[in-house]
Amino acid sequence: MKVTCVLVVLLLLLPYGDLLGNSVCDFGSCVHNGCYCEEHRPCCTPGSCSSWWPRCPGSMMDP
C-alpha cells in the first residue's frame, strides 16, 4: 500500500518535472518544466524558469 501511494505521488508530480528550474528552453519550443519561449527571441537560462514561474526573461515577458 505504501509503495502504491508513493507511485501515485510520483506520477502526479512527473508533469511538473524540474521544480527547481534546471531545464533550459530551446528556441520556439516548450520543455517539460513548463517554460515557454517565443521562436525568434533568446530563451531562459538555467534557474530563471520553473513550473511556478513559467515565463522567462528575454522571451514572452518582453513587449
UniProtKB/Swiss-Prot annotation:
Q: Which GO terms describe its cellular component?
A: extracellular region
Q: Where is the signal peptide?
A: 1-21
Q: What keyword terms does UniProt attach to this protein?
A: Disulfide bond, Neurotoxin, Secreted, Signal, Toxin
Could you tell me where this protein is found in the cell? Secreted
Q: What's a Gene Ontology MF term here?
A: toxin activity
Q: How is it modified after translation?
A: Contains 4 disulfide bonds.
Query: What does UniProt note about where in the body, tissue by tissue, this protein is expressed?
Result: Expressed by the venom duct.
Q: In which family does this protein belong, per the annotation?
A: Belongs to the conotoxin O1 superfamily.
Free-text domain note = The cysteine framework is XII (C-C-C-C-CC-C-C).
Briefly state the protein's biological role: Probable neurotoxin.
Q: What is this protein called?
A: Conotoxin Cal12.5
Organism field: Californiconus californicus
